[in-house]
């Protein structure tokens, strides 16, 4: 099975400009290719991971990746299938975000070894050197307004309005392809299926300005089995930065993937062989309640993104919280595992009587209910049941001198911080 056949078997090929020519190029020699990442935030997220891992698969097959950080295009904003104009960021912010994204990409691509080691480029380096007049004369003249307006990504915005700034975005992305082809012999661009219009602007410019053929391959935008856009948890993006989405939160995200999606996602998001995945699928279908596919997915992706130690920690947090063994976890581990539960910062004037604190921290709705909860054995401090109405919280209840975990019943948690 050649690399293109494997990508197809994994469900990673959505569209290509000329499949036969692309397969020929990929099987006959080394292809230089690029994927672009606009710094629209200070971190990449799961939505980017499909293209990143596809790029890594091609590198493992001997081809040479260029990772383009859009320091210039990030200043403009991509209108593709967006309902409204993006807010423009300052140059300083975009350049700072660009540096962070560069660091994240080095986790996945090999920038050190071999003749196909990855290269990092930033389109701010060339766009900052081109005058507006030169850009219009040397690039803009190759694009008709009719051609630009025919793009689906632009059509959707015509009625609601699109600025010239965003309208020109596709020409800038097209010029990226031309520049990388001219300087580095890059002949293939990879990106999400929503980028098709912008990406083919590059092949158009190559054809008209340099009489060369470029290839485009899009990867699918991933949705779950209900059709919902994939990569968000409770409406929030799942970030690759551990400070924005902890390894534990990412682990839980994958653990909660629906059965109908789990095997498909193993093909897309892991480097397990297709034979290994087929074996997992057989075992998974025989005992779905054991969630083997989800557990494997969580292990593989968290290890890939954050490393084996982070995976082991996420697994330990999961197991200890499930068993109620709060004291077996550090304060930092508890912050990860209980990041979504109510948090109350204890004030110096607060009463440390347990009944009072249950009401103050919002764990019990009233003192009467709080007393009943304590007497009925429904209150746990750091996993230990407390039934003393006169119990006073003390330093002994602080884990690592930072926090106390109170549980009411089986599932209602609150974290007291000091």
UniProtKB/Swiss-Prot annotation:
Catalytic activity reported: tRNA(Tyr) + L-tyrosine + ATP = L-tyrosyl-tRNA(Tyr) + AMP + diphosphate + H(+)
The keyword Protein biosynthesis is annotated on this UniProt entry: yes
Record-listed L-tyrosine binding positions: 34, 169, 173
Domain S4 RNA-binding: 352-418
Short sequence motif 'HIGH' region: positions: 39-48
Gene Ontology CC annotation, any one: cytosol
GO terms (BP aspect): tyrosyl-tRNA aminoacylation
Family annotation (SMART domains): S4
Coiled coil location: none
Cellular localization per UniProt: Cytoplasm
Keyword Nucleotide-binding: yes
Gene3D superfamilies: HUPs, RNA-binding S4 domain, Tyrosyl-Transfer RNA Synthetase
PROSITE patterns the UniProt entry points to: AA_TRNA_LIGASE_I, S4
GO molecular function, one term: tyrosine-tRNA ligase activity
Keywords in alphabetical order: Aminoacyl-tRNA synthetase, ATP-binding, Cytoplasm, Ligase, Nucleotide-binding, Protein biosynthesis, RNA-binding
Motif ('KMSKS' region): 229-233
Domain of life of the organism encoding this protein: Bacteria
Subunit-level organization: Homodimer.
Record function comment: Catalyzes the attachment of tyrosine to tRNA(Tyr) in a two-step reaction: tyrosine is first activated by ATP to form Tyr-AMP and then transferred to the acceptor end of tRNA(Tyr).
Family membership noted in the UniProt record: Belongs to the class-I aminoacyl-tRNA synthetase family. TyrS type 1 subfamily.
PANTHER family from the UniProt entry: TYROSINE--TRNA LIGASE, MITOCHONDRIAL (PTHR11766:SF0), TYROSYL-TRNA SYNTHETASE (PTHR11766)
Protein name: Tyrosine--tRNA ligase
Gene: tyrS
């Amino acid at each position: 099975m050649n690399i293109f056949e494997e990508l197809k078997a994994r469900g990673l090929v959505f569209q290509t400009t000329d499949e036969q020519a692309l397969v020929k190029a990929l099987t006959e020699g080394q292809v230089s290719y690029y994927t672009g990442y606009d710094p629209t935030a200070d971190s990449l997220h799961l939505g980017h991971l499909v293209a990143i891992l596809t790029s890594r698969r091609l590198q493992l097959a001997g081809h040479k990746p260029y990772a383009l950080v859009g320091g210039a295009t990030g200043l403009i904003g991509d209108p593709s299938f967006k309902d409204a104009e993006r807010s423009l960021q300052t140059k300083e912010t975009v350049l700072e975000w660009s540096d962070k994204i560069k660091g994240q990409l080095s986790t996945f691509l090999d920038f050190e070894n071999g003749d196909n080691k990855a290269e990092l480029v930033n389109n701010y380096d060339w766009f900052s050197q081109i005058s507006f007049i030169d850009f219009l004369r040397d690039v803009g003249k190759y694009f008709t307004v009719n051609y630009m307006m025919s793009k689906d990504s632009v059509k959707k915005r015509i009625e609601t309005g699109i600025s010239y700034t965003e309208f020109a975005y596709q020409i800038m992305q097209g010029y990226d392809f031309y520049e990388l082809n001219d300087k580095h012999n890059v002949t293939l661009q990879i990106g999400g299926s929503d980028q098709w219009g912008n990406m083919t602007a590059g092949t158009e410019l190559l054809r008209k300005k340099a009489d060369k053929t470029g290839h485009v391959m899009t990867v699918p935008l991933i949705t779950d089995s209900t059709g919902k856009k994939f990569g968000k948890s409770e409406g929030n993006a799942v970030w690759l930065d551990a400070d924005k989405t902890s390894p534990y939160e990412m682990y839980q995200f994958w653990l909660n993937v629906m059965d109908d999606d789990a095997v498909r996602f193993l093909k897309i998001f892991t480097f397990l062989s297709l034979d290994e995945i087929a074996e997992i699928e057989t075992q998974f279908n025989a005992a779905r309640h054991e969630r083997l596919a989800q557990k494997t997915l969580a292990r593989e992706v968290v290890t890939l993104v954050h490393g084996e130690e982070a995976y082991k920690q996420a697994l330990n947090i999961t197991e200890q919280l499930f068993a109620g063994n709060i004291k077996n976890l550090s304060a930092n581990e508890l912050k990860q595992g209980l990041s979504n539960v109510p948090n109350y910062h204890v004030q110096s004037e607060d009463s440390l009587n347990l009944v009072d604190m249950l009401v103050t921290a919002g764990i019990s709705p009233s003192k009467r209910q709080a007393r009943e909860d304590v007497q009925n054995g429904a209150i746990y401090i750091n996993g230990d049941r407390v039934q003393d109405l006169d119990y006073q919280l003390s330093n002994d209840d602080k884990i690592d001198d930072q926090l106390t975990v109170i549980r009411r019943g089986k599932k209602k948690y609150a974290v007291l911080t000091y």
